[in-house]
A protein has these predicted regions:
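N-terminal Rossmann-fold NAD(P) dinucleotide-binding loop
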Residues: 13-14
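C-terminal amphipathic/interface module of NAD(P)-dependent oxidoreductases
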Residues: 46, 50-54, 233, 240-272
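NAD(P)-cofactor binding segment of oxidoreductase domains
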Residues: 62-106
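Conserved N-terminal Rossmann-fold NAD(P)-binding element of oxidoreductases
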Residues: 4-8
């Protein structure tokens, strides 16, 4: 049995915690919400209040870093925060992890680090600050990768969807919507399973894309969502070829033996 601490018991982190508990692991985690604290604790997750602002603020969070595996799930904030804020958050996470001699870290990154160059890309793509789609996220990855005293695996998730996150709803009734580019989505269930798989199989010091292997067009996903769930589709779509795109390969994680429960975004289930 491993002890696993999840920094960020949110939309992905909380279901991952339940999944790991069911597998017999000791699970700890953090939330930024005092309202969620008691509910999480009552269900068996040792939970601390912790917010990186960008320095750590909270109560009782030091014990989170006394763990076998640290799962870092801090999404970048909106563009309203100063440039470099996210990198500073990750620096403080690393500092706490190193102080506590954490041996294994999983960092939740994003496929937004890849540029939209109208091509298929995999983990070997040579990212630089000049070509990346997100300098902030790439910088965060590099902070954790540099001068490290721990095993580190990075998961670059695509669009985290399913359950209450319905892609077509975000574009319902909108005009001039991009429809002809491939989607790079992953269902919540598979994002949880993939994260757990990396821990179970000891897949350390790697970078993996977390994206369903099939890539239907955006228009097809939005239209199917509207038909099945009963809301309006987009009013109109942009002309084909206007938007740049990328198609993210999931071959590397598939080669480890991982199997997606929902390999096609057209088959995602939702609970609106």
């Amino acid at each position: 049995m491993s002890s696993i601490s999840i920094i960020g018991l949110g939309w992905l982190g909380e279901p991952l915690a339940w999944h790991l508990l069911e597998k017999g692991h000791l699970v700890k985690g953090s939330t930024t919400s005092p309202d969620k604290l008691s509910g999480l604790q009552s269900k068996g997750i040792e939970t601390a209040l912790l917010k990186f602002n960008p320095h750590p603020e909270g109560i009782g969070f030091r014990s989170l870093f006394e763990t076998d595996v640290l799962f870092v799930n801090i999404p970048p904030r909106s563009k309203s925060v100063p440039e470099g804020f996210y990198a500073e958050q990750i620096k403080f996470v690393k500092e706490l992890a190193v102080q506590s001699k954490v041996k294994k870290i999983i960092f939740v990154s994003s496929t937004s680090v890849y540029p939209d160059w109208n091509q298929k890309v995999d983990e070997s793509f040579p990212l630089t600050f000049e070509n990346t789609g997100s300098q902030g996220i790439l910088r965060a990855e590099q902070i954790l990768q540099s001068e490290k005293s721990y095993d580190l695996t990075i998961i670059r998730f695509g669009g985290l969807l399913g359950v209450d996150r319905i892609p077509g709803r975000y574009f319902s009734g909108k005009s001039n919507v991009t429809g002809d580019s491939p989607v790079n989505y992953i269902h919540q269930v598979d994002a949880v399973r993939l994260s757990s798989w990396i821990i179970e199989k000891n897949l350390w010091n790697e970078t993996f894309n977390g994206v369903a292997p099939m890539h239907p067009l955006r228009k097809d996903v939005y239209e199917k969502n509207s038909q099945e769930l009963g809301f309006a589709p987009p009013i109109s779509y942009a002309e084909d070829g206007e938007a740049m795109w990328k198609e993210i390969s999931s071959d590397k994680i598939l080669d480890t033996g991982f199997q997606f429960q929902m390999p096609d975004s057209l088959d995602f289930w939702y609970r609106p």
